[in-house]
Structure formats: C-alpha cells, structure tokens
C-alpha cells in the first residue's frame, strides 16, 4: 500500500479514537494523526509517522502531549429562535415549575411570538453566533431543530434559515436540520386532529420534497403531543424518507420511549422519567438514548436520565447541549461533560464517547465522531492530556485547535499553551 500524502498532521498527541466501545475512548499516547484532504489518512505511533506517511508538505501541529479527539457532535439543539425568557427563569427560581409557567402563558408560546415577529436576518445572525460559540468549544457537527414557528409557513421559514446557517458558517461545521413538532399552534388548539392531519398531508411532504430536513422530531409530552398523534406524524415522516426522533419522558412518563422503539427512531432524547420498561424497549430496538443534563440542571430538577441503567442494558447513548431558550440556555460544552459525569454517572471516557461517536450514531452519520482511516477529518486539540481533565476542570473551554474536514476553523489565542500535568 502506498504511503498517504498528508495535508495536515497533528503529532506528539494523546489520541482518543472513540471507535471502540461506549466505555473506551481508545486512548493512544505518543500518537499522531495524518489527514489527507477531508479525511483521516493515518493514525498511529508518532515515531512511525515519517516511515508511513508522506508529510513533507503538510501543515504540522505539535500537540505537545495534548489530547486529540474527534470533533464533538452536538446532536440536539434549538439554535433558531428570537427573544428571551429571563423573566420565566426568575419565576422558576421562585418555585414555579416549567409546566406551571407554560400553562400560565409562558414557555414555548413566548418564544413562538418573538420568533414569528423576528426577521430572517436576525434569526440567522443569532443562530450563527450560537453556533460559533459551539464551534469554538470543539463542536464540528450540529443538529438544529425548527419548532418555534409551530404553524406550517413559519416552520418552513425556520428550516430555510437552518439551511442558510451552514452557508453563514462557511463550512466550519456540518449543520443537520430537523423538522420539530414542538406543540400545536395556538390558532389550532381547538382542532388538534386537523393540525396533525394537515401536517401529514402537506407540511411533511413539502419538507421532504424540498429536502429541508433530514430528521423529524416530535415532543411527546403533556401539553405537547400524545403518543397517538406523534405516531401519525412520525410515520408520515418515515414514509417520506425523513428519519424519526422523539423528545421522550422529559417531564412525565408519556410513552415516548416505547413509541421510539416501535417506530425504529434514531434517538429518544431527555428520558428523565424513563421507567424500566422503556429502558428495555430502547435496548431491544437499539434506539440511541439522548442525554441532555444541562436541561435537568437548568430546570432545577435532581431527576436525571438513568444513564447507567441505559448503558448496562446495552442502550447506545449520546450527549448533547440541548441549547434552547426555555430549558437549557447554554452552549457550554465543558459543563455538559462535567454534568454527564457528576449527575448521570458516566465516566469521563463514556462522556467523551457519547459526545462524539454517540452523537454520530444518533444522527446516523457513520463517518463522524471517530478517528480512523477514512473517517471525516473533524478533530479537536485540547489544552489538556486526558478526558478526565476535560470533565474535572468544569465549565471551561479547553479547545485549542478545531479542525473541520481537514481545515483549521478555530484556533484559541492561547494555542501555544497545553496543560498536560
């Protein structure tokens, strides 16, 4: 086999391949990664680099003992919205629950009004700023949902803005759009059946026809959609080639996880109220469990998703920020990793794999979330030498260099400094 000709090399690194198992980050000390174009061409011992790779013309980054991982895959976000809900946050700090606030006119309805009133340019600029904050922390793939328009014209508008987001970022991250059914529009609450029927007959086919979304997601919850309504929406989406996903068991045990298993969804996300039957259903169907600990923290709850039970049952798991204005107003990757360890019971290695390979699996993107020959060259050099350090020094951005498709897209001002103690 001829030697690959590298265009980019990261050497003197601790490489985490994240391609072994959910509990094994695949650490390779004293390693290097060679990139050819947009793909990983070689991974191995640093001392073997010159013999096995033609790196004479490559850009070389000396990791100085730092950790190199796959680019993070944020598999659950709501980046496109307008307005704020700081007043609602204060109400919850005073003891009101999320559902109580929503039933009194707050919640998604507040964001829907602001989003509908905002011009496209504002929505795009705000979403791009949020995405840039994620990229600067090592995220190279972002799933982005619609969901705050609620009615068909507004949902189509939001999905078109999500498509523009990829161009606005200049290819610095992969953007994967999702049509989200968040709630019945206020104009149609008197005839829910008509809304579901019209969505299945018109909105979903148009989204599929115009290729505006890869996924279709439904919020299965009291006050949102019942399992039977979600089943109709998701089956219509599947029939049109969209990949189904669900928000499940976040605030109540609503049967969303079992529905996800029944329909073969790519993922069931949240799961704070998941019971043993739901765990078993996800395990049997091999549906990815999407863990979103920032939401649990933000809502002031101590009832986190049963991550250990899920892993022990063989359920694949992903980890994501769930950045949104109502239940997780944060793009903090470091805090997400730390919460996964402190509150979900994951090891640092498990948290890292969940945020890389797990996210890729939730989005059905096999070339993402791992470092292996032929995989996408999405890489991060961190200012520390281990997954443990990433989770231990919490809520800090440790990303020094972020690479997307073999191109450096972000470099921290302190990129010369690596703390590998």
From Swiss-Prot:
One of its GO terms (molecular function) is imidazolonepropionase activity. Pathway: Amino-acid degradation; L-histidine degradation into L-glutamate; N-formimidoyl-L-glutamate from L-histidine: step 3/3. N-formimidoyl-L-glutamate binds at residues 148, 324, 326. It is found in: Cytoplasm. The keyword Iron applies. Its main location: cytoplasm. Its cofactor is Zn(2+); Fe(3+). It catalyses: 4-imidazolone-5-propanoate + H2O = N-formimidoyl-L-glutamate. Binds 1 zinc or iron ion per subunit. 4-imidazolone-5-propanoate binds at residues 85, 148, 182, 250, 327. Catalyzes the hydrolytic cleavage of the carbon-nitrogen bond in imidazolone-5-propanoate to yield N-formimidoyl-L-glutamate. It is the third step in the universal histidine degradation pathway. Belongs to the metallo-dependent hydrolases superfamily. HutI family. This is Imidazolonepropionase. The gene is hutI.
């Amino acid at each position: 086999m001829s030697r690959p000709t590298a265009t980019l090399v990261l050497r003197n690194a601790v490489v985490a391949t994240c391609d072994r198992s959910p509990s094994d980050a695949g650490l390779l000390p004293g390693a290097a990664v060679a990139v050819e174009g947009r793909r990983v061409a070689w991974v191995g011992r640093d001392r073997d680099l010159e013999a096995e790779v033609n790196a004479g013309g490559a850009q070389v980054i000396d990791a100085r003992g730092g950790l190199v991982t796959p680019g993070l895959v944020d598999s659950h976000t709501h980046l496109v919205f307008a307005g704020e809900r700081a007043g609602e946050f204060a109400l919850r700090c005073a003891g009101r629950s999320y559902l109580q606030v929503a039933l009194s006119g707050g919640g998604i309805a507040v964001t829907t009004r602001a989003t509908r009133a905002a011009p496209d340019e504002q929505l795009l600029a705000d979403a791009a700023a949020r995405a840039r904050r994620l990229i600067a922390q090592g995220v190279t793939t972002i799933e982005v949902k619609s969901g705050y328009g609620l009615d068909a014209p507004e949902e189509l508008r939001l999905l078109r803005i999500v498509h523009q987001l990829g161009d606005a970022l200049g290819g610095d991250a992969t953007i994967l759009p999702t049509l989200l059914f968040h709630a019945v529009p206020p104009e149609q609450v008197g005839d829910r059946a008509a809304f579901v029927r019209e969505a299945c007959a018109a909105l979903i086919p148009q989204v599929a026809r115009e290729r505006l979304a890869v996924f279709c997601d439904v919020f299965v919850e009291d006050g949102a959609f019942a399992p039977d309504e979600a089943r109709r929406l998701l089956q219509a989406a599947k029939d049109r080639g969209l990949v189904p996903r669900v928000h499940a068991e976040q605030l109540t045990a609503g049967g969303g996880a079992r529905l996800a298993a029944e329909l073969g969804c790519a993922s069931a996300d949240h799961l704070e109220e998941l019971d043993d039957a739901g765990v078993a259903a996800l395990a049997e169907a091999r549906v990815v469990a999407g863990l979103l600990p920032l939401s649990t923290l933000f809502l002031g709850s101590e009832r986190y998703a049963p991550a250990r039970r899920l892993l022990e049952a063989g359920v694949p798991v992903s980890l994501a920020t769930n950045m949104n204005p109502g239940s997780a107003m944060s793009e903090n990757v470091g805090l997400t990793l730390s919460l996964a360890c402190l509150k979900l019971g994951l090891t640092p290695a498990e948290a890292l794999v969940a945020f890389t390979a797990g996210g890729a699996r939730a989005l059905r993107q096999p070339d993402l979330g791992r470092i292996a020959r032929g995989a996408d060259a999405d890489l991060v050099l961190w200012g520390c030498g281990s997954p443990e350090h990433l989770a231990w020094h919490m809520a800090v951005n440790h990303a020094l260099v972020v690479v997307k498709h073999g191109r450096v897209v972000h470099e921290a001002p302190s990129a010369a400094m690596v703390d590998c103690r």
